[in-house]
Amino acid sequence: MPAFASLLAASAAARVASLNLCTDEYLLLLAQPEQIVSLSYLSRDPLESPLWRQARHYPGNRGSIEDVLARHPTLVMTMGGVGGRSTALLAGRLHIQTLSLPYATDLDGVASNIQRVAAAVGHPEHAMPWLSRLRALQRSAVAHGVDAIWISGHGDTLAPESLGAQWMRLAGLRQRPLAGGKVTLETLLTTPPKILIKSDYRSGQMSGGARWLRHPIVRSAGTRQLITDGRPWTCLGPLMIPEIERLRRLPR
């Protein structure tokens, strides 16, 4: 068997644990179900992940390698160096491979992470449908989007060059620059955007952030309001692709 084919076969037999909500997303979308041995507890929460039904089929962990050792993983995935040197050292002693994905800062970074995870689990072909959909969105994106503001609890918003704003541009929306990364009630009252994108992340909770979004000025701002599923915006990974496709279909 050629060396590359042997490597793919070994990867396809991997037992994979994810210690992070964002790597949970990549793993659930790109691995075979039987390869997954543990996911972070957050992915099992309906308020945190659109994939919670799938995630509940697997044991949860609290984000440490010690939590998953009893599952005998051969590969442990984290993001942004979560767990640090201690995780890498322990994994090395136990002959467990680790894959630490970088936090993507642009759409190319998301595509790269998709490819890396698919290759790591021995199924590079699983990346292709997601990459094809992403490229289709990029090819068909308009040059100048509609003036828009993305908003979540407490008036938090996105920087105009952030990864979140790049996803918005694929939906034909141009994030307005705002001082301090905040939307004020005064802005919504005096210079509202053409479209207000409201995150529904934990919107049903009795929290200060949720109450801010229910303020009369926010609710009655003279602008078209679109509700977005706030959960994919936490990680800004491949689950943003179906959400952007959905936002495109909404009437403006």
Give the residues covered by each predicted segment:
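Extracytoplasmic substrate-binding proteins
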Residues: 15, 75, 85-156, 177-179, ...
